[in-house]
């Protein structure tokens, strides 16, 4: 019988080599185009290999396996691969979504002269995520973690001629540097107290792990997954091209923080206060983001805040000590969120770059395929039955209501679920119904290069939910006495929110609100939160640093060039004069002899 673990390791290494080779070939000169390997074909090959690895893993009785590639003696910086349920499933999903995005990029970025370079950056972005997922050592995890932050800056600020894009890229990398501080804190603790960076050693010595590495991982996840307080960079990242937004929000960087906590959950769950911290962060993020999405009119900003809200749900689920359920929602969210962004980019392209949903209507008549897929994605986001979002959100709400957590957290998450259904329906009705604003749109034709990847993601958004519900490991033992009201809670919230949204939209259309509306006040309040983190806090830090700098300057003038300096220069002279013995006869005789000699020289010479 062949060594199946060795085959799995070989397949994973082959996938990385194929991606790296394809990325390098994109930089070959045009004269060597025949030698280049199309990134889309490379993604197809790697995706098929990943499916093969999943089938092989099912045949192995062990839940996970570790394979070492390189084992130096210093600090145990082993390049080892972790092959388990989480890594194999998520790598396959990331490859499938990236392949669809690369196909979409050919149409969306067709006029960009650096299309090959852009594709290479997308591949490197994916490779860094795969390295982070598959690593069984903190060192390669740190390399993948940091590379994701760097690639996010390069991709978000791709249109560097625009000030907003450059500023958003800098904002993203600065917030990610804060997350890196947390990861490096855990990294340094492992070197100092364990003399090893191996994850198996870290888990084996769980009783010795203090609050420092736990705090570092929480800080890292909070920054990378844009939790409340460190969230402003995620909506700002919408200034990048649509393929970047789709890949960033679905299967790469923003999911890395939650994935870190899922992978480290066996040791994190033993720490007192960890569950409460995750629940607080997740509930606050979900409620704030869903509330903010209600007030937005920019299409991509609404989708960005919806991602933020779902990340809060995942974080709260980790806090409920259900990592499998959080991972399931992470995977389900990836499909419909990538499809939603690609549809938004297609709709905006058809409207000559317009992103304000108040200026969109009747797109179902203009782009029927894209509009239908967009409707499917919004329904999946709202948790409509038998779509991907339903299978995970229904279980999350059911788990929340059956758990013994504080009802404040449960209420915040349930209100966030209602808000999600409301802004999802608002987007759908605003964009798809009504009469098109532009007559030219009636002749618009959807490009197959654009619609094919969207339709593939739509099919995945329909099928994968039921597949996951069959093959996901058990989350908990089902309770036989579960009340029907709890079982139908998610479905009830979805339909209640839908009816409420339709009523509010009809009310707004029939009776427009005055200029000084509650919505404007709420928007201003939301902006003030960003001002606190970006203005007030920074102003106080600058004032404190300025005060310190002035104190240092004053001390310098006082000690180096002021009274202290004069005092220091006079002390040696005074010390020399104070060493005289006070013998007046001796001094007078020396003076007299010197005077006689000088007088003799002056008279006779």
UniProtKB/Swiss-Prot annotation:
EC number: 7.1.1.2
Localisation: Mitochondrion inner membrane
Transmembrane regions: 11-31, 49-69, 77-97, 120-140, 141-161, 178-198, 202-222, 244-264, 273-295, 302-322, 325-345, 371-391, 408-425, 457-477, 488-508, 584-604
One BP annotation, GO: electron transport coupled proton transport
Record keywords: Electron transport, Membrane, Mitochondrion, Mitochondrion inner membrane, NAD, Respiratory chain, Translocase, Transmembrane, Transmembrane helix, Transport, Ubiquinone
Pfam family, one: Proton_antipo_M
Entry GO terms, CC: mitochondrial inner membrane
One GO MF term: NADH dehydrogenase (ubiquinone) activity
Main localization, broad class: mitochondrion
Catalytic activity: a ubiquinone + NADH + 5 H(+)(in) = a ubiquinol + NAD(+) + 4 H(+)(out)
EC class (word): translocase
Membrane topology type: Multi-pass membrane protein
Biological role: Core subunit of the mitochondrial membrane respiratory chain NADH dehydrogenase (Complex I) that is believed to belong to the minimal assembly required for catalysis. Complex I functions in the transfer of electrons from NADH to the respiratory chain. The immediate electron acceptor for the enzyme is believed to be ubiquinone.
Similarity comment: family membership: Belongs to the complex I subunit 5 family.
Name by which UniProt lists this protein: NADH-ubiquinone oxidoreductase chain 5
Gene: MT-ND5
